[in-house]
């Protein structure tokens, strides 16, 4: 009796709203657990399909789509192929038109100036030719061996040309060698005569002439070249020198080279040094005069 009374009293005194541990959804959650399992499987399949679709539209932190390498290549190729499709022809402004006209006028003026320059250069060439025609000419003849070949040259050039100067210098050198060779030959002839006289004397005295005969000398190399027995071989340095002289005459830059050569440069430097020394002397003289004036004022 007492237990039943306590249970009745507890049921009457119990209030669900005052009970903090009471959860009315517990009973329904257990009952609907089996039903919800099937629904969860369907939702998982839908989520997987959504994830697969979303990989093609990945959004970066800044909000734009993140493109794959293939997508970027396709986009660049598309832009390259269709880069001229979006160009719109617009009317040319007056400013651009005026600039274009100015450029055309400038190009025409340049062409006109070039024609004038060509006419002037032709006239200067004619003047040079006329000047050369009135000048004394020199005929240059050369026969030499170069690179195993015998080369023959014959040309007529003005006497003031670089090639003519080089040729005349070579002639002077050859003349000097000729004179040296002739003096050598004379000395050798005198020696031979003296030897003959001594041989005659020794023959009279009974000494064998063959033993006292001097052996014949080989003729000098320069004498062979002068006599024509040997053709002069031209070295690479001499050939380049001749080619340079020919080029100078062809281009007509002999006067320009003589004006800007080493001697001309040294002369200019000497002149500038003299000018500097004169200025320095004048400055020293002015300083001396100023010092004299100041000394007189202090006295």
Curated annotation (Swiss-Prot):
Instruction: Quote the protein name from its UniProt record.
Output: SWR1-complex protein 5
User: Residue ranges of the BCNT-C domain?
Assistant: 216-293
Transcription found in the keyword field: yes
Keywords annotated in UniProt? Activator, Chromatin regulator, Nucleus, Transcription, Transcription regulation
Return the similarity comment.
Answer: Belongs to the SWC5 family.
Q: How does it assemble?
A: Component of the SWR1 chromatin remodeling complex.
Q: Which Pfam families match?
A: BCNT
Q: Which PANTHER family match?
A: CRANIOFACIAL DEVELOPMENT PROTEIN 1
Q: Which GO terms describe its biological process?
A: chromatin remodeling
Gene assigned in the entry? SWC5
List the InterPro entries: BCNT-C (IPR011421), Swc5/CFDP1/2 (IPR027124)
| Coiled-coil segments | none
* Broad class of the protein's primary localization: nucleus
Record region (Disordered): 1-71, 177-213
Q: Does the keyword Transcription regulation apply?
A: yes
Q: Would you name any one GO CC term?
A: Swr1 complex
Q: Which function does this protein serve?
A: Component of the SWR1 complex which mediates the ATP-dependent exchange of histone H2A for the H2A variant HZT1 leading to transcriptional regulation of selected genes by chromatin remodeling. Involved in chromosome stability.
Acidic residues composition-biased segments? 12-22, 36-48
Where in the cell is the protein located? Nucleus
């Amino acid at each position: 009796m007492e237990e039943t009374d306590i249970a009745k009293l507890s049921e009457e005194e119990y209030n669900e709203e005052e009970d903090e541990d009471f959860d009315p959804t517990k009973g329904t959650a257990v009952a609907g657990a089996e039903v919800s399992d099937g629904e969860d499987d369907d939702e998982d399949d839908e989520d997987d399909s959504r994830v697969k679709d979303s990989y093609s539209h990945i959004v970066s932190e800044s909000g734009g789509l993140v493109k794959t390498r293939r997508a970027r290549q396709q986009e660049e190729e598309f832009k390259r192929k269709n880069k001229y499709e979006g160009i719109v022809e617009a009317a040319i402004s007056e400013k651009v038109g005026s600039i274009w006209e100015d450029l055309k006028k400038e190009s025409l003026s340049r062409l006109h100036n070039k024609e004038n320059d060509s006419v002037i250069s032709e006239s200067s060439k004619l003047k040079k030719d006329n000047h050369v025609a009135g000048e004394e000419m020199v005929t240059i003849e050369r026969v030499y061996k170069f690179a195993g070949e015998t080369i023959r040259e014959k040309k007529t050039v003005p006497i003031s040309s670089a090639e003519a100067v080089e040729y005349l210098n070579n002639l002077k050198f050859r003349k000097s060698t000729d004179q040296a060779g002739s003096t050598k030959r004379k000395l050798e002839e005198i020696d031979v005569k003296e030897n003959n006289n001594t041989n005659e004397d020794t023959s009279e005295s009974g000494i064998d002439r063959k033993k006292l005969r001097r052996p014949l000398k080989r003729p000098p190399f320069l004498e062979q070249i002068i006599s024509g027995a040997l053709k002069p071989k031209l070295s690479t340095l001499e050939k380049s020198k001749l080619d340079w002289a020919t080029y100078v005459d062809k281009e007509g830059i002999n006067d320009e080279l003589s004006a800007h050569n080493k001697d001309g440069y040294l002369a200019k430097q000497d002149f500038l040094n003299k000018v500097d020394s004169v200025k320095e002397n004048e400055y020293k003289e002015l300083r001396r005069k100023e010092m004299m004036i100041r000394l007189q004022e202090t006295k």
